[in-house]
């Protein structure tokens, strides 16, 4: 069809075409390995289309009619995959017409050449390296034609899958047929000594093997989940939430096996511990660093146990950084059960990109703050607002009027201080609190009581009171709600304690004296800039409690004292109490009970139950579980 010198000169077109095919399948393989499922990006079809156009040209130049014809048909299928998701989607009838015209136009030049040159070869063997190979016999040509036909049928299979599911994916049969056809064609072109096609079909075996390997590994997970729940809590607050969750699970499903990670409260409710929660209790950079290998070992133990047991639902309670690693690993290993995270990470304050992780890997997110629902209005993630556990705890609190007598506290009016639970927080915030109290108008008429989170902190508090020349007493943390109910006003460190004060309707001023390094991290690394920082103010979207947050240059004890003087006015205190009542009503609105929540979760199907793009119905019907 073309002069011999031109045939040899243009031979590299086939090599360039294979570079495009190779890049397309390398990209597809890379994304499939990354996501542990067969992914088909749009770029796959674009690069394959360019490769097909070049291979059609190669088929014409090298007088290889089957190559040109099959790649012409494939080109139409590539186009159909690109067109299926466009706004101008063509009908199936139009696509079939395009296919027929393409095949006709491809066959026409060969037909004309055969008419004028009856001795032309329909499948020439270039053998550009002049290897001493005898011409292949009829049986080799039959193997070659069978291989090429089978190999090309994979895209017709994919096309049928595309039209039936209206989704551009590569089903498992695509890879199986591609491997068989590619292997036969590979043998044929070795026999004929055609370097381009040896490279093309030899490299073409790799994507089929790689994707079949991914599918096989994924199919080892049973679609039928065992009637059990995995529940994990890594902190004391999570242990409290987990015990309540377990209590309701056992009420609904008494025979349900629950295993995982939990503390004493969860174990009392029947959790079968794989690891005790106390083993995760590490704090501080050095302690975490020295325990890193132990933590990794525990992490590996957990995800392997979950994959082996294959429970219906995985519940992860708070402790987000560890649980995110676990959740991502489970999904990447093919776990298709429901994953529920209890307590939304503070994405509204910092690291907002964590929202994408939640949406990508979870089925349901259980919320404890009312405004968090607004963060997921247009999200595919199912959210359920359970309410904050403190609301129930404080509503059930029974105030004992004789608590002051038990601690030998006089009936003098009280200003309460809640400087924090950590030694560093106590030293920084308590000094500001004491100086603000002494500078206020209440210093002469009120006594000062400091809530102590731990008995071992009492002496630190008393030493600081003495150093500042202030008389005061410590009150154990178990009496903190009594203290909140009976004080005229409180100074509280920004944190959960501020929400506790609001739910107890305690007139409060929020403070938080930060270290320079903390300020640097907040401003320049984590970029935490908010209109309010304490939960009562965030929830109500108004300033219930005055806030003094920052470094020593941002506020002074005298400014805090001025706020105390405002709260000395009964009208100001009453205004704060009314705002706290509004806060309580907000937090009690649209609350779903744990029992209703569990029923909803149980009724929903996991978003990850069936991976149509990887397994389709094949795995569901043909692959038996290995566990």
From Swiss-Prot:
Listed EC numbers: 2.4.1.182
Pathway: Bacterial outer membrane biogenesis; LPS lipid A biosynthesis
Assigned keywords, A-Z: Glycosyltransferase, Lipid A biosynthesis, Lipid biosynthesis, Lipid metabolism, Transferase
Superkingdom of origin organism: Bacteria
Region Unknown, annotated ranges: 1-224
UniProt GO cellular component terms: membrane
PANTHER family recorded: LIPID-A-DISACCHARIDE SYNTHASE, LIPID-A-DISACCHARIDE SYNTHASE, MITOCHONDRIAL-RELATED
Record NCBIfam families: lpxB (TIGR00215), PRK01021.1 (NF002173)
Protein name: Lipid-A-disaccharide synthase
């Amino acid at each position: 069809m073309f002069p011999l010198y031109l045939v040899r000169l243009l031979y590299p077109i086939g090599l360039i075409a294979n570079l495009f095919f190779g890049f397309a399948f390398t990209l597809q393989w890379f994304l499939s390995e990354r996501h542990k499922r067969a992914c088909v990006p749009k770029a796959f079809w674009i690069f394959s289309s360019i490769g097909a156009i070049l291979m059609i040209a190669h088929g014409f130049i090298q007088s290889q009619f089957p190559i040109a014809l099959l790649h012409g048909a494939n080109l139409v299928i590539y186009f159909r995959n690109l067109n299926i998701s466009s706004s101008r989607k063509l009908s199936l009838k139009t696509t079939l017409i395009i296919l027929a015209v393409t095949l006709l136009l491809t066959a026409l030049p060969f037909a004309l050449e055969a008419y004028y040159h009856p001795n032309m070869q329909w499948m020439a063997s270039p053998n550009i390296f002049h290897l001493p190979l005898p011409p292949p016999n009829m049986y080799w040509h039959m193997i070659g034609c069978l291989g090429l036909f089978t190999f090309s049928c994979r895209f017709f299979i994919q096309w049928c899958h595309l039209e039936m599911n209206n989704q551009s994916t590569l089903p498992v049969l695509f890879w199986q047929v591609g491997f068989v056809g590619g292997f036969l064609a590979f043998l044929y072109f070795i026999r004929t000594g055609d370097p381009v096609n040896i490279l093309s079909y030899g490299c073409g075996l790799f994507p089929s093997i790689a994707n079949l390997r991914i599918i096989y590994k994924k199919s080892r997970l049973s679609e039928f989940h065992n009637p059990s729940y995995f529940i994990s809590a890594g902190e004391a607050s999570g242990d409290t939430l987990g015990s309540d969750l377990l209590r309701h699970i056992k009420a609904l499903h008494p025979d349900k096996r629950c295993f995982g990670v939990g503390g004493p409260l969860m174990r009392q409710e029947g959790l079968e511990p794989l690891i005790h929660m106390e083993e995760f209790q590490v704090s501080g950079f050095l302690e975490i660093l020295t325990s890193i290998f132990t933590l990794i070992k525990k992490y590996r133990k957990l995800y392997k146990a979950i994959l082996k047991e294959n429970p219906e639902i995985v519940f992860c309670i708070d402790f987000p950084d560890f649980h995110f690693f676990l959740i991502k690993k489970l999904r990447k290993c093919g776990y298709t059960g429901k994953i529920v995270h209890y307590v939304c990470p503070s994405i509204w304050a910092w690291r907002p990109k964590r929202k994408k992780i939640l949406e990508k890997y979870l089925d349901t997110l259980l919320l404890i703050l009312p405004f968090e629902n607004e963060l997921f209005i247009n999200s595919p993630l199912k959210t359920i607002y359970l309410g904050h556990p403190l609301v129930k705890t404080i509503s059930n609190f029974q105030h004992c009027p004789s608590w002051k007598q038990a601690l030998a506290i006089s009936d003098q009016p009280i200003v309460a201080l809640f400087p924090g639970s950590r030694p560093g927080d106590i030293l920084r915030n308590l000094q500001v609190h004491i100086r603000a109290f002494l500078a206020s108008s209440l210093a002469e008429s009120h006594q000062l009581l400091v809530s102590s989170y731990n008995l071992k902190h009492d002496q630190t508090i008393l030493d600081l009171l003495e150093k500042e020349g202030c008389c005061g007493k410590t009150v154990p943390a178990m009496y903190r709600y009594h203290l909140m109910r009976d004080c005229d006003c409180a100074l509280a460190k920004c944190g959960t304690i501020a929400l506790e004060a609001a739910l107890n309707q305690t007139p409060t001023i929020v403070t938080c004296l930060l270290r320079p390094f903390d300020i640097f991290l907040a401003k320049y690394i984590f970029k935490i800039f908010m209109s309010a920082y304490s939960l009562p103010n965030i929830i109500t979207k108004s300033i219930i409690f005055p806030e003094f947050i920052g470094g020593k240059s941002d506020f002074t004890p005298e400014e805090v004292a001025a706020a105390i003087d405002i709260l000395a006015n009964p009208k100001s205190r009453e205004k704060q109490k009314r705002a706290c009542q509004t806060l309580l009503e907000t937090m009690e609105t649209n609350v779903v009970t744990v029992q209703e929540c569990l029923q909803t979760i149980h009724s929903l199907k996991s978003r990850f139950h069936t991976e149509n793009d990887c397994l389709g119905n094949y795995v569901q019907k043909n692959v038996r579980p290995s566990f």
